[in-house]
Amino acid sequence: LLVSACFMQAQTPNYYRNPDKIYLDSKEGHNGSFTWQMHKADETKDPAEKISQPGYQTGKWMPAIVPGTVLNSLVHNKVYPEPYYGMNNKLDRNIIPDLAKTGREFYTYWFRTEFDVPENYKDKIVWLQVDGINYRAEIWVNGYLLGNMSGMFKPEYINITDFARIGQKNALAIKVYPVDMPGTIKPKQWGAAGEFHNGGDGNIGLNTTMLMSVGWDFTFNDGIRDRNTGIWKNISLYATDKAVIRHPFIKSELSKPNYDLAKETVSVEVTNPTQRG
């Protein structure tokens, strides 16, 4: 569960990874190859165009865990104590500030890293794949805003070909915003007996996000303080030729009544990212 992963030391992934992709996992928490840093957005005076340039001097920015959440990294940096210890996560103790009380700006953060684009990506289409950010985000590469995201579960494939510097250092900066409606742990006035606290007051359901971030019967009734704000899934870099195939889908139709024959229909999405207009 993500609510558990938020506060645990991340381990080396044991799931399949495409060997043709460069995964931008952080050194912190994941033993990855990339240095990620974070800084509170409303305390960052420089414009995004500067923050997202290679060689930007981060100064007092903190190390960040990516994939991970804002609170994940804040706990890692000893800003807040471990939520799973004792009563640290109790809302009424206010040890870790709650998003519903602080407002969205409190957990809105910049994350940035730098990466090299390999020489063998030359004359190819270069992609940045962002698998999941909770909840909204601005994606900046080398001083340019290349994409916006909203919704916890929607991946984005961003064509960075015209902005990538082949064989050179590149910078990626992502401004991450929490959910629009964080909800509260106040129980709903409706529902089955014993589940009134599930999803708090229900307002978090106005976002496309993880409802149990505000509290559920098998996790913290008091919820997760930042509502799992952050870059919670992988970010990767890869290159393709001019034809791109994505989202394969197989539809099966079984013959009745014996179900001894099946008709299989395979569909894919094919695009040419070099086409303009």
Predicted regions and their residues:
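Bacterial Sec-dependent N-terminal signal peptides
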Residues: 1-13
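N-terminal pre-domain segments of enzymes
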Residues: 11-50
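Accessory beta-strand-rich segments of carbohydrate-active enzymes
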Residues: 12-20, 40-43, 77, 83, ...
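Predominantly extracellular/luminal regions of secreted and cell-surface proteins
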Residues: 38-39, 50-79, 228
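Surface-exposed, low-complexity/disordered Ser/Thr/Gly/Pro/Asn-rich loops and linkers
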Residues: 73-102
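Beta-strand-rich binding/interaction modules
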Residues: 139-141, 260-277
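Short, solvent-exposed loop/linker segments at the N-terminal edge
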Residues: 252-262
